């Protein structure tokens, strides 16, 4: 069942509109990428410019409310959201990539997956200590990637002002794993 987290502080008309848009533009793909998983596909959202604009606008509001000076997008779908948010704000954009995808010196963080580990990286000079960074991604599920991204940014002295996501899967422990980071989902499932 999909529902808006009515108790979320700071809900605005824009975030309520974004939740309504998301309900109509997220497709469930059964048993992908493995049996038993219901994948939340944002392709219908991306292929509908007006709907995508509403969602980006709500994410821009989240960034403004938190005084973000930099937007960090988590690979890969986080890039699709973070770039237009940074553009609308006139803010810096920091890509958080899978290991081995960035040229030059990097900082990395390794985190646990269900079966193994993964590593993400940022350029060593991507963020200055005085920057206020909003992390952006499509889904908060188990929280491993978001927690690692938060650690990377905090490790260079940036102030991470929150994690904005299209959807939070509330039946998974993502929020607990990224605590005390402020999580702002546009839609809670």
UniProtKB/Swiss-Prot annotation:
Pathway: Purine metabolism; AMP biosynthesis via salvage pathway; AMP from adenine: step 1/1. InterPro entries: Ade_phspho_trans (IPR005764), PRibTrfase_dom (IPR000836), PRTase-like (IPR029057), UPRTase/APRTase (IPR050054). It is found in: Cytoplasm. GO terms for biological process: adenine salvage; AMP salvage; purine ribonucleoside salvage. It comes from the Bacteria. PROSITE patterns: PUR_PYR_PR_TRANSFER. This is Adenine phosphoribosyltransferase. The lineage of its organism: Bacteria, Bacillati, Actinomycetota, Actinomycetes, Frankiales. The gene is apt.
